[in-house]
Amino acid sequence: MAVKVLVVDDSGFFRRRVSEILSADPTIQVVGTATNGKEAIDQALALKPDVITMDYEMPMMDGITAVRHIMQRCPTPVLMFSSLTHEGARVTLDALDAGAVDYLPKNFEDISRNPDKVKQMLCEKVHTISRSNRRLGSYARPAPVAAPVPASSPAPASSFASPAPARPAATARAAAPAASHSPAPKRKPYKLVAIGTSTGGPVALQRVLTQLPANFPAPIVLIQHMPAAFTKAFAERLDKLCRINVKEAEDGDMLRPGLALLAPGGKQMMIDGRGTVKILPGDERLNYKPCVDITFGSAAKSYGDKVLSVVLTGMGADGREGARLLKQGGSTVWAQDEASCVIYGMPMAIVKANLADAVYSLDDIGKHLVEACV
């Protein structure tokens, strides 16, 4: 069956061009259009589309408000269009927090002059998020930030709710989280925590990192597939929400406990044996900039068996080969479970390759990091 799409935008030109591009794909059907957020809610309730494309700035009701209402009344995967500016990044992150699944740059020049490029990106995104867990209501909003833990005192695992046990990788798809009785992670003197993610990652990272105490003992590196204009705004957002410090990584930054470094968009991040971050130009031969495999691979080379790596929600298989190198060196690999993923792609690649030491629900990953490292 064709993927049913509702196109929402106050620009007649953009609404028409998006509809034309999507309709040219025989596996996609545009079932309706709307010019503002209020119309979008009404059309979503009436047409029950599989995917909604949504603009932000619209009369009567903006896109973020519309997304919040839609998620409450008829949860539907939403693809936001956003500008590639710092303000556009902030708005897009707000939309993802409200429940949108993914985003695309809103570029009138591209949609006019590069229709083939836009068609490929847009149709691929629509197909991917149509298979997301958003409609099932299995991916809730971020957990509230816990009360601060004094940095001067250790944070025992008991200061958090008792974490759910791990699920064996072989049964990750079949077993429900509550049905698992596998052991919780063992403590180990990890020198680095490395987390990679893509679609659904901004909300997932927020959920994980807000559970960590200010005195978390291991340095953290974050690899999120995201454009260059977005990563600085995302790091600033996380820094305000978390008890640990978060910043966009710069060349020469030093890893240290209580600090998470986010790989800058459009570039690659590597780590050397002295704990120094190297930021390299994005290689055009690689699909992802930043690339999880690149950072994981450098961590494997520099830290041997002292890395705790986590692969969260995301499309594709980035992170699998880097995780393979980490496993070969004796390090630990965790994957997010299918039920709590927006897109079960990257974690599935880890599980199918038999690289996962444990599979955890998103709600439990932060707690388990505390248990394993603190």
Swiss-Prot record:
EC number(s) from the headed UniProt entry: 3.1.1.61, 3.5.1.44
Gene Ontology annotations for the cellular component aspect, listed alphabetically: cytoplasm
Main location: cytoplasm
Pfam assignment, any one: CheB_methylest
Record domain CheB-type methylesterase: where: 183-374
Biased composition (Low complexity): 154-183
Keywords, alphabetical: Chemotaxis, Cytoplasm, Hydrolase, Phosphoprotein
InterPro entries documented for this protein: CheB-like (IPR008248), CheB_C (IPR035909), CheY-like_superfamily (IPR011006), Sig_transdc_resp-reg_Me-estase (IPR000673), Sig_transdc_resp-reg_receiver (IPR001789)
Active-site positions on this chain: 198, 225, 318
Residues carrying 4-aspartylphosphate: 55
Region (Disordered): 144-186
Stretches assigned to the Response regulatory domain: 4-121
Protein name: Protein-glutamate methylesterase/protein-glutamine glutaminase
Organism: Pseudomonas putida (Arthrobacter siderocapsulatus)
Gene: cheB
